[in-house]
Amino acid sequence: MPRPTVARIDLDALKHNFRRARELAGTAYAMAVVKADGYGHGIRSVADALAPETSRFAVACIEEAIAIRGAGHRHSVVLLQGTHQKDDLAECERSGFEPVLHCQQQLSWLGAGRSPRFWIKVNTGMNRLGFRPEELPEVMAGLEEAGLKHLAIGFVTHFACADDSDSEMTGLQTRIFERAVAPWPDLMRSVGNSAAHFRPNQPLYEWSRPGIMLYGASPMEGKTGAELGLCPAMTLQAPLITTRVVRAGESVGYGASWTASQDTRMGMVAIGYADGYPRHAGTGTPAAVRGQRIRLLGRVSMDMLAVDLSAVPEAREGDMVELWGKTVSVDEVATCAGTIGYELLTGVTSRVPRVHE
């Protein structure tokens, strides 16, 4: 019989969160970003849940796009990193994938065979991928000369600081983008990551790209998902496998990093960093059992962690402990571990089964 440690995926929560994104997008359409195996939730099941809600998905690479096709969905699929080799363009054309082209090498691959419809990435200040605004006239002229401009769908950029409500950079990037693409009003525009949906008066143009918000985690500094009207889609659970009383003066776990100041009832939970639970989540990190919040004690081990059961004396072996979900948000755990909810959700390992409900 398998270990009961599990990630439960609430498909209704996914749908709720997408509808929230669509509501915030206003007149823009919303493409569902399902990269990184649907942010750890299972790309095929996420695509199944959201297919009736959207006409476009977005992924990082062609393997993820192929997984969506393998699930039977014929939606347009945007490849946010474009293609990594020339031969992939023919597959994009055959399968209806839309690569985001961001460099001269990718442009040079066009026209060598079957060319797909594509987006063009504009670097407005994040300086990861994309053409600088002053390079766009030459890019577009080259496409016109090669007879490929008709395959261009639109322009894309990505915000560096949209999660920070006090930052002025998003407004600056928006203005740079608008000026850069103004000569081609017939092409569509896409700028809005999850955080951009929550910025008042932020233009989202024709297509927004909600990602982390679809899974119920917060994209905004200082705001919880619940405060933003989102529902957690993943509940990570593991069983209590033993309980004991640690006597005053005794310590728990590797490094003896926590010592009891008084007799304390504790339990061991069958989950650890080999399952994707963050090793740096130390004493005080919240969890929950029987609907009540508890706290971690000491260091997280590879396959186990310890919790303080003082607040829930009725807790017993076999009870399921929520590591994150509806009682304890993934963002709370991430803060305690010095990271972000994105990393935790995408980091749940393959030995934790996903149960879609």
Swiss-Prot record:
Chain sites annotated for binding substrate: 128, 302
Active site positions: 35 (proton acceptor), 254 (proton acceptor)
Modified sites of kind N6-(pyridoxal phosphate)lysine: 35
One GO-annotated biological process of the protein: D-alanine biosynthetic process
Cofactor(s) essential for the protein: pyridoxal 5'-phosphate
Record function comment: Catalyzes the interconversion of L-alanine and D-alanine. May also act on other amino acids.
Family affiliation: Belongs to the alanine racemase family.
Stated name of the protein: Alanine racemase
Upper classification of the organism: Bacteria, Pseudomonadati, Pseudomonadota, Gammaproteobacteria, Pseudomonadales
Gene this protein is translated from: alr
